[in-house]
């Protein structure tokens, strides 16, 4: 049976086909604007549900399929006063907790556990009047709950190295365009003799701020660049693709921000097609 990957830390069914380590859609407004020097806490809560697993032609291919995934991720960000190449040096770590329920014909399972931790010790950010830029290299450390005999796994059992570039443009009349670009390079899952292909994906948001509230649209685009490698790989290389779009709202209040977003997936290939809900809380220490 092919894999299902969704939500934080790549919750999986059987093999790795169908998605990447990154939880697509996690970022939106201010995706490229790293905050000023200081220490920050960000909490992500997400719910993903899908009742269709599409083949390479975009048609539902697994009768009776369903996945429901709930993730809560604690992120800690520290930005220093030190500059490298003119940009402020920062770092962050993500610690995800995941519950995933999967159903396929004749089988079902629900499992809770620690997802793979993400670290980046070298984030650089640049700021001007209207433009903000950031770069980094996120490293997905395979410490999450994983057992190849289970239908659902919060962890992935392999490393992912993810170069990141993000930008945010803010106009004089409070119009915003933000985008975060990522490219994933995966190592082999030795327990399954399976290596997921390289992936390109981006999160985006376009919005307008009215007072303390920003409203707009956002989502993500994901496409797999190289073929998977392993004994269960089909002739199309198990290459996945999906696009998602939906409304986003952000509210700022006294050093805190609250973000709500909904994302509807369309045109999925070799992966689930469903919908996501996000709640994001940001505060400075």
Predicted regions and their residues:
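Residues on the lipid-exposed face of transmembrane beta-strands in outer-membrane beta-barrel proteins
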Residues: 31, 43, 74-78, 119-124, ...
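Outer-membrane pore/translocation modules
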Residues: 96-196, 236-238, 252
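Outer membrane beta-barrel transmembrane domains
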Residues: 17, 60-61, 192-285
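Surface-exposed strand-loop-strand hairpins of Gram-negative outer-membrane beta-barrel proteins
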Residues: 16-20, 48-71, 105-110
